[in-house]
Every structure is written in structure tokens, then in C-alpha cells.
Amino acid sequence: MDPTFPRVVFFSNEFPSDDLKDLFRRLHQQSKDRRFKLLSIFLEESTAILKDEVAKLPRPLKELVPPFDSVLALANVDFRQGPLGAAMESSMLTILELGMFIGHYEAEDAEWDLVPSRTVLAGLSIGILAAAAVALSSSLADVAKNGAEGVRVSFRLGVYVADISTKLESPQPDGTLSSWAHVVTETTQAGVQDELDQFNADTQSPELTKVFVSAADKTSVSVSGPPSRIKAAFQHSPALRYSKSLPLPVYDGLCHASHLYTQNDIDAVINSAESVIQPNRSVRLALLSSQTGKPFAARTARELFLEIGTELLTGTIYLDNVTAGIVEHFQLDSETSGKCQIDSFRTSLVLRGIYSTVEAKFTKEQQQLIRRDLVCWVHKDFGPRRPHSHASSKLAIVGMACRLPGGANDLDLFWKLLEEGRDTHTTVPPDRFDLNTHYDPTGKTENATQTPFGNFIDRPGYFDAGFFNMSPREAEQTDPMQRLALVTAYEAMEMAGVVPGRTPSTHPSRIGTFYGQASDDWRELNASQNISTYAVPGGERAFANGRINYFFKFSGPSFNLDTACSSGLAAVQAACSALWAGEADTVIAGGLNVITDPDNYCGLGNAHFLSKTGQCKVWDKDADGYCRADGIGSVVIKRLEDAEADNDNILAVVLGARTNHSAEAISITHPHAGAQRANYRQVLHQAGVNPVDVSYIELHGTGTQAGDAVESESVSDVFAPVTPRRRPDQRLYLGAVKSNIGHGEAAAGIASLLKALLVYQKNMIPMHIGIKSEINPTIPKDLERRNVGLAMENTPWPRPAGKKRLAVVNSFGAHGGNTTLLLEDAPERVKAQSTEDRITHPVLISAKSKKSLQANMESLLSYLDQHPETSLADLAYTTSSRRMHHSMRFGTAVSCIPALQKALRSQLCNPNFASEMRPIPNEAPSVVLAFTGQGAYYSGMGRELFIEFPYFRAQVQQLDRLAQRLGFPSVVPVIDGSIEDSPASPILTQLSVVILEIALARFWSLLGVSISAVIGHSLGEYAALAVAGVISAADALYLVGRRAQLVEERCTPGSHSMLSVRASEDAIQEMLASEPETAAIAYEVSCCNTYQDTVIGGLKDEINNIRMALEAKSIKCTLLDVPYAFHTAQMDSILDGLEALAMPVPFKAPSIPVLSPLLATAVFDVKSFNANYLRRATRETVDFAAAIEAAQDMGLVDTKTIWVDVGPHPICAGLVRGMIPSASVVSSCRRNEDSIATISKSLVTLHLAGLTPFWAEFFRPRECEYSLLHLPKYRWNETDYWIPYIGTWTLDKAHLKHGTKPTPFSLSMSRPSALRTSLVHQITAETVEATTATLHTISDMQHPDFLEAIHGHTMNKCGVATSSIWSDMAFTVGEYLYRRLVPNVKDVHMNLADVEVLHAQVAGKTKGSVQPLVLQAHLDLSTNSMSLAWFNADGETGECAAESFATATVRFEDPVAWKKEWARLTHLVRGRIEALEQRAAEGKASRLSKPLAYALFKNVVDYADRYRGMDSVVLDELEAMAEVTLVPERHGTWHTPPHWIDSVSHLAGLVMNGSDASNTRDYFFVTPGCDSFRLLNKLEPGVRYRSYVRMFPLPEDPNMHGGDVYILQGEEIVGMVGMIRFRRVPRLLMDRFFSPPTTTSVAGPAPPVAAATAKGHNVIPTTPAVPTPAPAIATSNPIVNSAIAYKTPESTPPLAPSSESSTPKESPIATPPESERADPMDNMVSQCLRLMARETGLEVEALTGDASFVQLGVDSLMSLVLSEKFRAELGVEIKSSLFLECPTIGEMTAWIEEYC
């Protein structure tokens, strides 16, 4: 392009109209080409800057952003409905425009042609930030670098604006997007401004929330403001209401608002200190202001971004000025060229206007306007792609763990072994195999080993199965390599301080596992002796690291590698490659080897790999092969920059890692020096390292003649060449760990790496012990001259000052592979200068069993005794923020190490410690925030939090700035304590309290406290309403401040007073009335805090008289130190003014329930809160006690609920405890106590109660000052799960022949079928004879049509098949078979009779799975009936269950008989319907609207819209009628759509589950079936039906109701459900009955408890009248069974817990707060026994140790009830199957003692 043209580059504030996802995909794809190098750099920088900014977000916002490794990943996520919508949209627009700009130049291979004298940049809104990056650039490379700053500022701007704007108006509770800006066309700015001024004045809108003009041009005006205010303004003004206007897609808040933002806000967004551009960088190109149309005056980058920030936040956009500025530029510079050019990113309405103006101007002057689109290039094909080079970050090893021979079960023991020069080889232990039978040194015995030696780890079978959620059976079948991979992975992560999700690099989706494994001994030998369920997952190699990913919920890559002897180090190299490729951010890698199989010994011996004389003799002249070894090792690796950002301890740095192959070797197993040399050089070149700078090499060193000779040659040639020779001070030391611990095969490389890491840590190279006689003569003779040699004694390896030591680790595979790692020292960490002033620190310890918790506590105590200098701050940081927390917990907040030691000793010395120890509950308790009133005010409240926590400080400052913009004084001096604690004005007092409380609530949210409800006491209710989203924070501040002003103006301070009385309202009245001198005294009840704590108010003298009178009666009274008496007549003078102020304020439905002390209830709706509510709340009584009681009655709170007192001092805490004595209450601040200490104690309490706070956020402000301590590792509760190899069958098989196995059954559902509907999918068998027919069909409940029908009826958030589904299937099959026998029949009328459903069918939640069921039908014309049975089937084998889950009979009948029967009943039914209508009109029966009726249904079942056919209902106890209209859509292929059947019949379910006559709080009602179901004609959509039912108790079963449902069309009965039955079921069993299936096997025999479905409310358990013994089966869900239950093998005895045994299948996971723990003398066993006695009706004395549950009548239903009661009342989470695994009282109590 000719640079002489005058040019404008226009950056829009709108995305191009193209498919945005496609644009970003193309941009991403093009960036991979070497041609677009600068584009690639820009996108990488933008990704990095966004990662950095996201990492700085508060955790609640951070969690909204999925892990991403490119901007493309973010472009595919819809953020619009969340609080990050503006931030993401702004930054992505900036990235897109700058990316297109850079790519355009690279695509054209064009020179930078933006000449400052002839180029002007322009943009609107966010587009100016992209333009700024170009304005600061003098080359395209500069744009790539500077663009990241534009991205940073645009993201920060979006976050900041959204945060401020939510304080002006809360988002809609349902997430609906509302526009903050409307455009009005065909009007003038002055006209619109007049209308807005009038609206703002009339409504007395606060300045902050006024509606204003944000942009204007000659044809349109943009109006901005809070959405509700804009709506009100347009309704208020006829001119606006009838104008042409449209909402703009501005959903995240306000910009261009000079009344809202100040310089502080601009500085907060720009934050020049974090800029990636030098602040004094010069502005190179003119950039036009969108406000003035003139170039910004800024000369430097800092000035430019500040000016832009000012314009974006406070300036009005005037598009006409921008256009004029562009025209002026062209006019000044177009005369010489005759041409001008506008570059843009596609076109837009704004740009077309600019084109039009420019062309109109220049046409007269015969000038040419050139338009250039900078987006077109991205769609071009540039030929074959040439990729960029790979990433080259350094990598950091941050954690390691091992199980190695010689008892080296941890790193300290491993180092001790090396330091002492120990040789660990022994003969093969008997638990592996018997040398007496399997060892033959002559080699004559087939399959016998010729060497008896090896190196073995201790106790390979020991494992903590309960910790890893494995049953004893699964643990036993699982390869010890897999088990120890889990264990060492955990220990390595523990050392590394990895807490999944704590940082971006440790997000579970970004963590991968890579393990090397080269043998399957356990699967092939030990476990194969009795192959069981877990044979495949327990033995196949892929499950070794797959199990790690699954247990820890990592979704990054999972690879198991086999490269023979180098597998372990090759896995590390593959892991490093994944980090360099960006496939993961954290990797866990290692090698695994546990020897058990003599076959491998034999094979290796016969191939001459193994030494017959003992250990590996590395570099010894008598080297004769290697000695086999066990080994398990794991390391944790990250990119160096991530490790540093995460504050990790770095053990060493990986500079390079490579693997190649010895392709030119003389044989596949022979090493090749040339290949080894090539691999070393590749690694050195990768890192840019001089080989002579390497000072230590850990050799592969197997002790074979060929291997040692070749490796010594390759190492000396590369690392110690003859020339250039090493200097004397450049000694190269060599070592080989195999001489100590043998050759671990797949674990050999990881063992070598662990040794090298320890060498770095200890600054010592341990002695080499491989040379037993003399050095191998094949080793090069000139090694010493080359300054190379083995470390024959322990040799210091000091780190030279200012330099880093380099080391190499080798590992070679017998198949020819060579792997090499290059390491260097970790960066020297300069710990930030501590400004630590926290006086109290939380220290936490946890475990998954009592034994482990106690051992962990003992370990820490021992560590502290040995390390008294330990920093408490570091210890708190390590145990809280850098640990995964488990169900058994100990925690305390202490101020010094001795205090911690004392607390630990106190607990450990407590003889009742084990019995008192309780796991946390499976579900975290609910949390209610209680906001205090103004009585707790003092200067410096929250001071330490304000100083210490930037987030809290920012919240306070933002709220304070809003208050100041509203005309109120700053409260910061009150918060930070810079003003004296003296009487302050009501305005300052009340505003500071409300600001503190709102900031505290958000701080608690930052710390991970999820809020279930809020309650506010008096003034605190304003904060509660703001936090619940009812009013905005700005409106809360406005109302509180203006209310305080009204009080000051209209009330006299000191004329009234308030008195707190420790007595009830009635008691006060009675005592005062009993005395003549006090009987007439006037007072009012201001607050009913508890039923024994009342606040009264009135005239000062009269209140004083009351105080003296009550104190004379020994009643405690406290005169409150307040100048005014709120909630009394003194407030009358302000009420009208307050209500008027609140009238314009928008009130929204609360996002969380609000407990209202005024209404004494919990509020969920949008109508309860309004201006009148605030008036009443100021004047009327604060009934705090009644609000809490209502919350209890409604089930919102219970004894386990945690209450957080939010305010300056815990006043509400005492009130809550007064109502709920056992309540756990924590504080936010406390007078005369450091607020960080208060928060620390509260967080510990919450942690122990079952919440897991975001400890990382608590330590985040000072994280760089803390060090991660290397504390003792987790103490496992281990049991030996070893399957010994029995016999000599590995020898015997040499003489046996092998057979074959049959091919497994294959199920196919893809064949054509003569009958196929939405529910009946395929005929599998059909037989038709003269008068009989049989049909078998199969259906998949996961088929979309079937699944959608099921999900139309959900219970407990699970789709449950309604019996209308079985009805349609019965009618479908019935008509099909009947027509097969009677082909010419016109209509088939069917009576579906004797329906009995034994098991509920719950839709599974596993995507891609099948959930088949089989329907078997047999029709007999001689009886005109058809029997039906439904069965579950196995999804893999097709095997049908032995027993059906439902049965029914279809009778083919004459409808004439039905009409006659119903004609006799019609007048009775119509009479009852009319009577119900009359009672409803008289108010004696309830008339329910459609929404209310189905809202009542939601107590048990949630129907989809298509099922909601009832338009209205009249309900009178157990009788009801409904008007019904069926939806027109059939939604599938059916005989009779299930949603139509349900709509006309489920009235019975509503009666049972929604009537006041039913106890729906404790029970729900479900149906096991009905006697008949008939329809005279097919149901029709649009026709109005009526349903009627009257339910009644059945005399034969007190828990059962029955009734007939009549279906009427007009005045005639057209259908009937005869005797539909409903059974009453305890509500606490809801989870048991209605949970998705978890397995895919065929169900075994049904237990005596069953769940069934039918019309109305469709699922029920049925139990025998007499309890029967539970059958000996164990299912994952013994009630709801979708063909999903495993039989317990008869040979497997029930678990018998003991101190020696492992955890049974279900371990409890629960730990309530300390305040709820049982008395030590009243231990858990006695509590459980009492509960069992109560529930079974037995005496406690009958529950003896040898009594069996079968004998006691505890059947499967009772076991379910007991397990739920244990959970609900005792906090113990066990499943009912435990009653089978522990069949006697004695076994059960032993289990409880150990695990509860």
C-alpha cells in the first residue's frame, strides 16, 4: 500500500457479523503457520495475560472460567449471562481486532506502512483500547507486544464495570439479561436530556442511579442507567415511551458515566504498575478521542491509557465528532495524493455513516476513498502450513515419593541407604514364590529361575483401601503396582502442596498422569488364580494411572508406557513433552515394578540378562548381568513459571528430555554408543548447554559387560571429550543407583531420577558400591585424564556461588530405547520480606480414618518437637492452603507453636479421643448469614481485614466511593480506625455498619462459604437485602444514609431510649401491670430477639422507670447506648419521607431466601419487599425470634445449620443460640479482638463442621512470604492385601495344552422391527398361533424418546418412569398382538388391569450407555386377556433378569358394558364435582391455579411442561377435581402419549402429596399400581376434560390409601382408573428410592422392599405385612433397581470388622462441629443402639452382641430407615448394605467403634 495516502484505521466497538467462533478458529489455525509468527506471539501473549488476570480474580469469579490454553477455548464459551460477560467480550474483541490487524500485514507480507504524519487511528468504546496498542507501535512486532496491554486493560475494565454496576442494581435472579442502554432515534440530545432530568427529579433518584445520556449523534441518543430505572424512565415520559427506541446489547453495566466514576476508579482499572508496556513509551500515531474527535493529548503510554480510561468510564461518545475528526484528517492530507483510505474490520452501521459523510465531502473535491477490510485475509488458503517450533519452558520438579528396596519407603530412608552405601539384594522372599521348587541353577527345570536373587520392597501388599474408596475385594484383586502408584502419587502431591483447583495450573482438567510399567506379574500370576470382578481394572496396565486420574478427578491426559527398562524415565520424558506441548499444566509421572512371577525370572535368565551371583556390579570386571528389583516412584512436574507462581518448593529444574532408538545396533537388545551420543547432544542442544558444564551423571549402569562399556564410551565422548578438555575444577562425577538397589526395570529410571534429586537436595554425591573387585577393563582408560570418574566415597557437591549445577540422568531400554534428562539447580528463592502481623493462625490435620488422624497428629507433634524453630505462619499455610482435606479433622487457631503442641497433646492424651472423633457430614451444612444492627458500632471495626486483604479493602473502598458519590461522608476512617472511637453521627454510624457488613458478606463468599439464607436485625436488614439481591448495594447505602439524615432532621436525640430486658414480652407486660405505679407507663416492644430477650423503647424517663421496676424484681436490664429509639413512635416523623425515598428503588426477588423479622417468615417472592416494607421495618417490631422459628418450621435451618454473625460484634450470635441452643455460630469481627484472629477461628469452626473454605484465598495476600514446609507424610491405615502364589503351576503348565473360550453373547438393537414406537424399540421374539400369540420386545431407556418421556417426571432430581409409560407400552403391544390374531377388528378396547410395579425405573446418568428393558407378553383369545411382564436386561450381555420388575394384565372388553357401568355413576360424580365447586366458592375448599398445583407437586415430583395438563384444581382434604387440557404435541410415536395419560389421571397423586390431610413434611406417597385403567375413546388434544377422585384409607393396611379416578368429557365419564393405591413412605428414604443406577448388571432377586410406578405420583416401595429376613444380596441401591444389582458370591463371607481389618465397603464420611459432639461417656455405640432400639421397637437390652439383624426383624426396609436415621441424627453416613456385611449387633458395634 502506498504510504503516501492519508489513512484512518478504525477499531469498532462491535464484533464483525461473521460467525465469531469460526473467525477465532481461523485466526487460531492461521497462527500455527510460520508465516504468521507475530500473530502467534500476540495470541500467546494474550492467552498468558488473560490467564494472569483470571488468576487474580476472586475465586467465585475465577471458577466461572474453564481452564484454557488458547483464546480459542474462551471464544467457544458463552459468558454473557455471568458476571464476566463484559470482561470476556471486551478482551475477545480486542484480541480479534488486533489479531486481524497483525494477520493482515503478515498475510500480505507487507511492510509497516503507518506513517505518523499521514495516519490517524480512531475507535469507539472498547475499540479504542485496540487502537491504543497500535498507536504505541512503530512496527508490527510492537503491536504483537503492546496488544497484550490492550487485552489486559479491556478485561480489567469489564470486570470492574460489572462489579460496580451490580452494586447499583442486582442481576435478575433467574439470570435473564437486561440492557443497561437504549438507543432513541429521530430525536435530539437536548430533548432526551430534558425528559431524563424531569424523571430523575420527579422520582428523586440518587445521583448514582440516575438515567443519563451516554452517547449521541445528529440522529440518535443512547440512554444509559440501571435497567429498572431505564424502564421506569420510559414509562414516566410519554415522549420516550412513544419514541423509536431499541435496547442495546449492553448487559453488564455502565460506562461513560461521569457521575459514577472518579479518578480512583480509573487508576484501579488501568493499574499502570502492572502494565506490560514501559509507561514512558512514546505515542507514535495519533488516536482520536470518541468524545471530542481530536487526538488524545497524551505523549506516553501511561498518559494514553489513563486518558482512554477516563473517556471510557466518564466521557460521553459523540460520533459526529469522530466523523468530523476523520474528515479533517483527510482534508489536511489528501490534496497531494488525491486518495484516502479507511481500514476497518468489516463494516457496521456506524462505519457506513462515516463512509457516507466522507464520500459526500470528497465527491465534490474529486477525491477517491479506498476501503480496506482487515478481516478478509483470514479466509484465504495460504497453501501447506509450516508450523512454529515447540514451546521451550523450563520445567520444575516439585514433589516426589517412593517405595524402594531395602526398606526405603520414603525419601529420607532412601537417602540414608545411599549415604551408607548399602546393598539391598536378597534371595527371593517366600511370599513371592518358593525358591525350593522354582530355582534350578542348572537350567534343566523348565520354567524355573536360574538365579535366586533380587531387591524387594517391604510389605508390598499393605494398602489403605478405605482411603482410596476401594472395597477389600477390589483392593486384593488390584495389582500392588497400581495401589502403590496411588499411594506415591498422593505422597508426591502432598510434598508438592498440590491441592487440585487451588491454582490455574492445578485445575483437575489440566493435570495428567504418565507411568511406565513393563510387566503384569500380579494379573498373570497372583490374581489369575481366582479371576473375579476386578480382574481387568485391577490388572490391566492402563488402570494404573487411570485409577489415579479417576480417584483425584483429573481429566488431563493419562498414559501408561512400556519401553522396557526405560519405562519410568520415558514416562517422565513423555510427561515433560505434554507440558511443553501445552497438553497439561501439572503432570504426575513415575515407574512401577513389583516382582511376583517366576516366569519372568526364567525368561530373563534364559536370555542372559540376569546375574547369577547377586547384585548389579556396575563397571566391575566381573559384571555378569543385572539383579532384578521392585520399585515404585512418582514425581510431580510443572512448568517453572507455574511452579514459581504457585509458590512451590522446586527440587530441580528440567532443561531438556529426549528419547531416541538404537536403530543401528547389532541386535535389538544390544546398546549403541552412537544413538546414546546423539540423544545426549539433542538434549544439550534443546537446552543450549555446554556439555562440559555438566558435573554429575546418573548412569543407566546395569552391570552388564556390553551395557557398561557402551555407556561409558558415549558419556565420555560427549561430556568429557579429549578436546576441549575439562578444566581441573570441572570434575564430572558418575554414579549408578543400581549398584545399591538393583535394576527396577520399569522403575529403574525413576529411581535414578529420585537419587539425582536427592543429590541436589543434599549437596552430596553418595558413594558408588558397584565395583566389587576392580574396574571393568572395557571402560575407557583415559577417564581420569578427562577429569571423569565414579564417586567412590560420599563426595560433597556444593552449589557454586551465582551458578547452577547441571546433571544428567540416563535410562536405556532393552528394546533399544534411550532416554536422557538434563537437570539444573532450582532458582535460588529469595523469600519476600515478611510483614506478617497476623497473630492467630489456623492449623489443620485431617485423615480418612481415626487411626490415620491420630497418627498424623502424632507425626506433626513429633516434627514440632524436633523442629522447635518452625514458623507458625508457614505451618498454617502448609496445613491449610497446601493440603487436601479429608473427612476426619482436627483443627485449631493458635498464636504460637507451644500452644499448638499443647492442643495436640491434650487431644492425644484424651482417653476418649477415638470415641469422640467424628467424620464430617457427607453434605456440608447450610450456612445462614445474620447481619447485626447499629448497636455494635465502634471505630476500627474490621481494621485488620481492611489492611490485610486487598479484596475486602477493595469492596469497602468501592462501597465507600459510592456513598461519597451519593453525598455522604467517607466511612474508611471508621473501618481503618483512623478516627477516634467517639460518638459519631447516625449517618456515619449506620453507613459504616452497612458497608462493613456487605463487604464482609462478599469476603465470606470469597473464602468459599456458600450462603443458604440471610437474616438482618434492624439496620442489618438493609445489608441482608443487598446481599440477597433484593436491592442493590448503592440503593441500600442511599436508603440507609437518607434515613439517617431524616432521623437527624426530624428526631430529637436523647428524648427516647431503648432497654434490653432478659424476659419475654408477656412477662414484662405482666410484671409492669402488677404494680400500680408502672401499670400505666407507655412503652413499645422494639425487638423480640428471643422468647426471653426483649428490647423495649419509649420516652427516656418512662423507660428509666421501667428499668428500675424490673431490676427491683431481679430482671436483668441493659440500657442501650443509642441516641434514638428505633421501632417506636419516635420514628413516625420519618416514615412518609422514607417510603417516598424508597418508591423509585427497584425491588427484586431474592436470589437466596431472606428470613424476615418483620413478616416472621422466609421470603422467596418478588412482591413481599417494597417501599412500604422498609417503612414498616423501621417502625414495627423486629421479631427476630419468630423469623428463626419460621425458618425451622419451613426446613430452611436445622440444628446442623451454621450461623455466621456478620457485623462489627457478634450480637446476633447470642440471639441465635437463644433460639437454637445447639446452634453453631461463628463471628466475623469482635470488639477488642484482632479481626483476622476472629476470622481464623471462625474458619476453623466451619472447616470442622464440614465446609472446606478456600484456604488459598485466606493466605493469598501474603503467599509469597510463606514457605511450603516438608512435613511428615500421611500415615496410612494399612491392611495386607496380598494374594500368595500357591503351588507350582507355572512349572506344571509347561506340560499342559491350552483350550479356547466361547465367544461372548453380543446384543444388537439396530435390526429392523415390525413394531417400533418411542417406547417399544425392537421385537426379539414373536410366535403367533391360532388363538394364542407371544411377543418379546426390547427397549432402551436411554433412547432419546424414551429418556425424554422419563425426564418428564423427575423425583429427587432423577428421571423416574411414570406408570403412564407402562400403560402406553401395554396398549401398544396389546393392540399389535390382538390385530395379529384378529386382523379385521375395527377398534380394540383394552382394560389395563392388575398393574403391579415392584421396582422403580430410574434413568441412568451415564452418557452413551444403554439401559435395556424387556417386555414379554402372552395373549390368549380363549380368555380374551394378555399377560405382561417387564424385565431389566444387562446392557453388555443382553441377559434378562430372573424376576420381573412389573406385571399387568390386558383384558379385551366390550366398551358398551363400560358405558352402562359408568352411566350409573355419572350423576354421583357430577354431584361431587358441583359440591367441590360450591365449597371453593364459599372458601371452604382450596382452588389452585395451574402453577400452584404443580408447585405443590414439586414436594415430591417435578413434571415437565408437557405433563402439566391440569389447568385448575379444587382440593378439599382427600377429595379433588381438576380441569384438564391436553397439550397438542404428541412428542413421539405412541398408542396413547404418556403425558396425556398422566395429565388426566395424576390428580390422585396431587391429593396425596399436596393436601393438608396428608403429612407431607415427614412422608411422601407413591403408588404400587391399580386394579384397572380404561379409556372409552382415544384422548384428544385441545378437548377439555375433568378429573375427579376421592381417596380413602384402606382398612387392610394403615399405610395405604386408595380411590377411583374418573375422567369426564363434557358431562359423561369417558375413562377411569380403578382403585389406584398409594403407600406412605418416610421422606428420608427419598434418596434411597430415587437415585440413578450405578452399574449395568442384571438385577438379582428382588429384595422384599420394592419401588413401583403408576399414575398420579408414580413410584412407591411396597413391603410385606410381616417383616421378612433380608435376602443375602448386596446392591448399590436395594430399592430402585434398573437391572442393576450384583449378587454377593456365596463363597464370600460377610465382613467381620476388627482392629486388623480394612474399611468395609462403605466408610462414614462426616465431622460435625465441636458443639454438636456427643458426651464422651455417651459414645457413638450407645447412641446407635438407642436409635436402633427406638426404631425397631425393641428394648436396648435385647440388642446383644450375638443377636443377628435377621432375628431382630431388621429387614431391608428397616435397614434403609436406620441408615438414614444414622445420617440425619448422628451424622454417620453408612449404607444399608452394612447390615448384610456386619450381620450381628456385635460386628456392627465393632465397625462403629473403628470408623465412627
UniProtKB/Swiss-Prot annotation:
The protein's Enzyme Commission number: 2.3.1.-
Pathway named in the protein's UniProt entry: Secondary metabolite biosynthesis
Domain annotation PKS/mFAS DH: ranges: 1321-1631
MF terms in GO: 3-oxoacyl-[acyl-carrier-protein] synthase activity; fatty acid synthase activity; phosphopantetheine binding
Domain Carrier: from-to ranges: 1719-1796
Top enzyme category: transferase
Region listing for N-terminal acylcarrier protein transacylase domain (SAT), in residue ranges: 18-256
Pfam families linked: Acyl_transf_1, CurL-like_PKS_C, ketoacyl-synt, Ketoacyl-synt_C, PP-binding, SAT
Segments of this protein annotated with the region Disordered: 1688-1720
Keywords: Acyltransferase, Multifunctional enzyme, Phosphopantetheine, Phosphoprotein, Transferase
Keyword Membrane on entry: no
Domain Ketosynthase family 3 (KS3) residue range list: 392-825
Cofactor(s) needed for function: pantetheine 4'-phosphate
GO biological process: fatty acid biosynthetic process; secondary metabolite biosynthetic process
Bias (Low complexity): 1697-1708
UniProt KW Disulfide bond keyword: no
Product template (PT) domain as annotated region, ranges: 1317-1636
Function: Non-reducing polyketide synthase; part of the gene cluster that mediates the biosynthesis of neosartoricin B, a prenylated anthracenone that probably exhibits T-cell antiproliferative activity, suggestive of a physiological role as an immunosuppressive agent. The non-reducing polyketide synthase nscA probably synthesizes and cyclizes the decaketide backbone. The hydrolase nscB then mediates the product release through hydrolysis followed by spontaneous decarboxylation. The prenyltransferase nscD catalyzes the addition of the dimethylallyl group to the aromatic C5.
Domain-level remarks: Multidomain protein; including a starter unit:ACP transacylase (SAT) that selects the starter unit; a ketosynthase (KS) that catalyzes repeated decarboxylative condensation to elongate the polyketide backbone; a malonyl-CoA:ACP transacylase (MAT) that selects and transfers the extender unit malonyl-CoA; a product template (PT) domain that controls the immediate cyclization regioselectivity of the reactive polyketide backbone; and an acyl-carrier protein (ACP) that serves as the tether of the growing and completed polyketide via its phosphopantetheinyl arm.
Protein name per UniProt: Non-reducing polyketide synthase nscA
